[in-house]
Amino acid sequence: MSDLLKQVQKELKEHTTTDAKAAALKFVPNAEKVYGIRTPVLNVLAKKYKEGGFDLVKELWDSGAFEEKLLAAKLLNVICKKDPLFSLKLVAAFSKDISNWAVCDAVGMQSLKPVAQKIQKEIFDLSAKLIKSRNLWERRLSLVIIEVFTKDPSLHPEIMKRVKMLEDDEEYYVKKAVVWIKRNFEKGR
């Protein structure tokens, strides 16, 4: 464990509140190892620790606490322009260890957003791989990582193809992602 990770963990503990912990456990029932930290604090920490780079992203993810994984996703968002394809590889690796909707959505919607247009093909390739997974969180992620592209009408047929592949999925959180993408189309987002 690096000194930088210890410093981040110390700061996370300093920002812990019982209200935030109760809220996280209420809204993310299967969250594990919850500190109890509000999202705005994580956003500030992501910017503060960007110099930790990809090494800190990996360390945070591997530490395994709920907010550490969220912070890893947010930090990746801040630094992904340094190496978009490596950032995508991290998202692919992280996909195997996702265990709740909040981390899934943070990884899928935030980690690659600044480089999504630049690596669009590669993101769709990863989506195509994840959609076939037995892991429900990888299937959900297969839609969440392409949500950013719902604003582009030229990509709607490709996105709808994926939505249709998961329309009959048995898993609640996969169904929620399907509904979410369809709603984006209906609202023109």
Language-model region placement:
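Alpha-helical scaffold domains
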Residues: M1-R189
